[in-house]
Amino acid sequence: MPTIQQLIRNARQPIENRKKSPALRGCPQRRGVCARVYTITPKKPNSALRKVARVRLTSGFEITAYIPGIDHNLQEHSVVLVRGGRVKDLPGVRYHIVRGTLDAAEVKDRQQGRSKYGVKKQK
């Protein structure tokens, strides 16, 4: 514990909150261009080939973003919209690509949870 004299000399520093999605720079979403589209494997105990993209954002950051849903049409130079939200079993993946906007097509034949995958209501 510091003495009063030490506190007078050097005041206590407030603890700074760490942002969970710093690359968005306080915006709800950011536009970016895919630099690379590939698959990675999740950490234990899960097993899969998860689709991710390396995205260069308009804020200047290059991030790894998860591509949600079954099948996708993304390739290098695709323009995508990125939102925050991590993927628990993929270390370093702290962003999601928004489906159904810009170059990311919506998920085909999706009936439930459509809003998360950019699918319009069926007539």
Swiss-Prot record:
InterPro entries: NA-bd_OB-fold, Ribosomal_uS12, Ribosomal_uS12_bac. One of its GO terms (molecular function) is rRNA binding. GO terms for cellular component: chloroplast; small ribosomal subunit. One of its GO terms (biological process) is translation. The keyword RNA-binding applies. It is found in: Plastid, Chloroplast. PROSITE patterns: RIBOSOMAL_S12 (PS00055). Gene3D superfamilies: Nucleic acid-binding proteins (2.40.50.140). Keywords: Chloroplast, Plastid, Ribonucleoprotein, Ribosomal protein, RNA-binding, rRNA-binding. SUPFAM superfamilies: Nucleic acid-binding proteins (SSF50249). Part of the 30S ribosomal subunit. Belongs to the universal ribosomal protein uS12 family. With S4 and S5 plays an important role in translational accuracy. Located at the interface of the 30S and 50S subunits. NCBIfam families: rpsL_bact. This is Small ribosomal subunit protein uS12c.
